[in-house]
């Protein structure tokens, strides 16, 4: 199918590289990359008994037709490297894991990055060796940055999606401007941070991504 220049809307690809990460290095180099992070991890602590690592990459080329008839195209590279280690001491085994990635080519995983992931996984496992079970019951907890954001997403993220609010099935339907959280809570959805796995040039409706404040000082 031929797309006319009038129909085509080319997005500015400035939030991540258009390089296909799947082809950015040879298969043999991918194996070497995994062997390298395994070697780095094993040298960090004598109690390590097992290291597992995985490397994933994908490259999506999409074309979206908007309700106004415009055609928007985009590319979406994505890579991730994960490492898991098992340590053993005094007949007790514990595990630690780490990893990362984003919208990069595979050369993002430099020796420095590999060492950071390996160190994080090993340190986590070593701490777990002396860890005690958390007490049961209700209590105040402090969540650090990073993965705890998943809790926020699952708790309120889906309820703030447009489809549920349009249909009136969300707990937040019709509550714009009202208090829905503590005055100390502000939630921002930012799809424009360069190279982050949650960032896009355009969303699946063909709109340019932006920085959107969902909850400000407790108000929707």
Report the location of each language-model feature.
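Flexible, glycine- and charge-enriched loops at secondary-structure boundaries
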Residues: 1, 27, 111, 115
């Amino acid at each position: 199918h031929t797309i006319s220049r009038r129909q085509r809307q080319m997005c500015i690809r400035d939030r991540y590289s258009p390089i296909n990460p799947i082809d950015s290095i040879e298969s043999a180099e991918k194996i070497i990359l995994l062997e390298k992070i395994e070697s780095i991890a094993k040298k960090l602590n004598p109690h390590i008994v097992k290291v597992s690592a995985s490397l994933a990459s994908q490259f999506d080329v999409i074309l979206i037709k908007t309700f106004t008839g415009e055609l928007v195209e985009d590319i979406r590279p994505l890579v991730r490297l994960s490492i898991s280690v098992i340590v053993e001491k005094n007949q007790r085994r514990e595990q630690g894991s780490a990893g990362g990635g984003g919208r990069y080519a595979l050369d993002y995983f430099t020796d420095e990055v590999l060492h950071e992931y390996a160190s994080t996984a090993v340190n986590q496992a070593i701490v777990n060796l002396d860890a005690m079970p958390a007490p049961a019951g209700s209590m105040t907890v402090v969540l650090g940055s990073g993965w705890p954001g998943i809790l926020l997403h699952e708790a309120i993220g889906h309820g703030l999606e447009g489809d549920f609010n349009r249909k009136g099935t969300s707990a937040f339907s019709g509550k714009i401007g009202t208090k829905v959280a503590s005055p100390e809570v502000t939630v921002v959805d930012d799809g424009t941070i360069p190279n982050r796995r949650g960032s896009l040039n355009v969303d699946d409706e063909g709109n340019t991504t932006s920085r959107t404040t969902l909850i400000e000082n407790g108000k929707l």
